[in-house]
Amino acid sequence: MAELLACLQSISAHAKDMMALARSRGATGSRPTPTTLPHFDELLPPNLDFVRTRLQEARLPPKAIKGTLSAYESACARWKHDLEEAFDRTAHSISPHNFQRLAQLRTRLYVEQVQKWLYEVLQVPERWKAEMEKQRAHINATMGPDKTTGPGKRSRPKFHSEYTPVLELYFHFNAYPTYADRRILAEKTGMLTRQITVWFQNHRRRAKGPLPRMSPTAKIPMEEFERQLENLARKIVPVLLPPTLRRFAPGNENKSLAAASRQSAGKSSKNAKRLSELEKAQQVPRKPSENAEAGPSSLGAMLARVMHNDSVSKKKSKKAKKEKASQQNVVCDVEMRDATATKEKRRKMKKLPRAAGQPFDVPMDVERADKASRKAMKKAKKSPRAFDSRAELAFAQAAYPSPSQYAYVHSRKPSAQKPSSDSPRKDFGQLGKGRPSSNSTSSTVPPHRVSSRLNAMRPPYAFPAPYNAAAVPLTFSVASSTQFAFATDNRSFGFAERTPRKATVPAACTLIDYLISKFAGLRLLCVEQSVSSRSISLSTSESGKLAGLRTEGLTTGEASGVQTHVDSYAARRAITYVPPSAPLDCVVHNLARALQLKQVRPMVLAQPVVQPDAFAPFIARAERRARRKERKQRKALEEKQAKKDRKERQKASRSQRDSPSMDADVQSRASSVASTSSLPARKSSKKSRKSKGESAASSRATSVASSVRTPSLSSTSSRRSSGMSMPGTPRPEQDLPIMATADFNFAGDEDVTMTPDLAAQLFGEDEDGAAALGQMQYEEFSPDMLTFTSTAGGALSDMTADVNMPDLGNAYTSQQSVDDMNWTGFGLDAQNSASPGLFGDESNTGLDWLLSHNLLGDTQMSDLSYTAPTSTPSQINILGSTYACELGGSDSLGTPFNMNDWTFGLGACDDGFAGFGNNLLGGTAVAV
């Protein structure tokens, strides 16, 4: 190669000298004759009929045949287009004498690549058949062989009960699995999705109490899941029979397991001796002893036989007694129980008369066993059954192979580094005790969970094993035998990469092509140096070739620095580039300048590679269902509320129409009050209290039947149902809140208008039964009405009962003088006004003052005369409307003093508040 470069440099130097000599003698360069484009033969398309026939003979599915042919045809078409475009561009800079060789190179490259792809396509049927055989074997191994009872009957799928703990573990977190979870559970357990669905339905039907339910996007808490999984493993693993106690069938003896268990457990002479005895018991079949009882499984009989042999072989010495005591004191980590055996039903035997010397607990038809055997059986029953963790782990690894390679579909594949043989053995006795360490292999959950909440759903007894991709066949969900994609270069297609050759002697044809291309480049350089840039114009192809030579460094002064690689894509593979436009030799020395001149383009994929998420459609569907369910619930609530409001309006209109029927209740209350005056004092007081309670109850009942816009005055539940916020009743030491009409929000569109019927329902009617809104209402006043109570709940429950009962103690607190009764005319002091801040006895202030002056005892009522007090108007604000309250007496001064002459009335006035006292009547302030 060095000699070739030296020759080329000398040729270039001689050519330049010749051009300089000709230029010095006045010669001018002739215009180069345009090269004629060669005519290449048409590249023949691949024979698709032959490929289709071969695939059909292999019994490939029609869909797979169609996909394979379309991919093969499109790949060949792309390769043909790339070759034609590349060789057409290259033909401009090549001598016409080399057109034939260039055409041969073009045809050879096309045919070789098409033949390689044809070989790959014809290998598809074999791969597909092998894959189908693996899947059939996997199905037969997990689901059992196909057993059809008739020509038109399907076999019932087998339910794998060994995976029931896995389903129960999932049920502990979520009793309503989604379709995606049920599908994954079916793949993990080797069952059908329908079987998983039916199992969860039956389990939910039998379950008691509230069932757990998770949203479709929620994830199982993995810490609790791992803890439950380890607890489940501790419950299931002891059920498995260890290899030291398992009797192998003839021809299936596994000596490696016995040797491994002997090596792990044979650290002490006692363990080795016991293992040897167990091996002898397995190899030599012994006849069942006459005194041994038949158990539900072979496990109990084997343990009893071993313990019997130990008790017989050991001598009664101090050392044996010490060993026996230490063996009884050993606390085993897991108690061994045979949970797989069915419980035997024992028949109750009638007690028969026993023979002479026969014990009480033995039936008559059972032969008496010897004393030694009965003692041995008692010792065997009392001895603990220890669980060997190491032997159990060895048995589980042998009984259950390595997990499927698709257990890591949504997680990171474990490292393929094999542990060294001299590494210390892990302590598998700590299995299930606490959280596993980072380097422990006892955890059954693969790390790095990414997208699914069922990544770790594997049987708890499938212990980690070396990852072997060929051990477990593909499944239907992963195998995609109908999708093929062909690329236009070898590296993308999967063949061996084209690496640069070493500095060896190239082939003759390659050397000739190389020399031709280099001489063409030298010719262009000589033309550039010989003539001026304005005297001659180069074609587009020649200008591009010249720019490429400049990029490669093939200038006049740098011709000695040329480096060549005969068959190289190394520069293009250094970073990711577009596949070569032509399969010719090309080396880029100045990569930055080549990118700047757009000679080399970085490869940009037409479509971004997106890893599809298999669970995205199911999650989106679940979210749409949740939104649809929420809309339905909201609509149902709105319809229910509208129906309720409609019923309330109908009820309110019905109550307004039936308002005359309320007059009977008011008249009965008036008659009960009138009847109290004719009874004795004690009976009348009791009767008045009773009538007062009845009137309050009737007023509450009438207030409930009022309009829906009128707040209820009787119960808290009705206020809650009406949707109003009622003001609370302040305590005696608190100030009254400032309220207005706007503070009461009602359900209607209009404000409450006080009608005569509503006023009669709230405050009662007079004796004549005619109540008008603008008229005064009078009711007889009795001393029993001087005591008032206030509700502690803050509701207007007693307003209708107490609104017509004025307070004498606060009657004149708003006036400057309380001597309006002209008590000074009788020679008495003026009455002291009650303090406005107290509530305890202010209602009885007037009577206490009269009794203190002995006016009711010695003084005759007929001798009293007084001046009628001026009427004291007051205001009561109830339900947004204001009413006037007036307290006065008779105009006659000569009439005797009578308490019944004191009357008061209510009348309508404008909204507003004026001069409040401190008397609380059912949560409403009454200003008097």
Curated annotation (Swiss-Prot):
Keywords: DNA-binding, Homeobox, Nucleus, Transcription, Transcription regulation. One of its GO terms (biological process) is sexual reproduction. GO terms for cellular component: nucleus. Coiled coil: none annotated. Residues 668-682, 694-728 have a biased composition (Low complexity). Residues 344-353 have a biased composition (Basic residues). Residues 152-211 bind DNA. Residues 255-296, 310-329, 340-359, 406-451, 626-736 are annotated as: Disordered. CDD domains: homeodomain. It holds the Pfam family Homeodomain. Residues 635-657 have a biased composition (Basic and acidic residues). It is found in: Nucleus. Its main location: nucleus. Specifies A-alpha-4 mating-type. May regulate the expression of genes specific to the homokaryotic cell type. This is Mating-type protein A-alpha Y4.
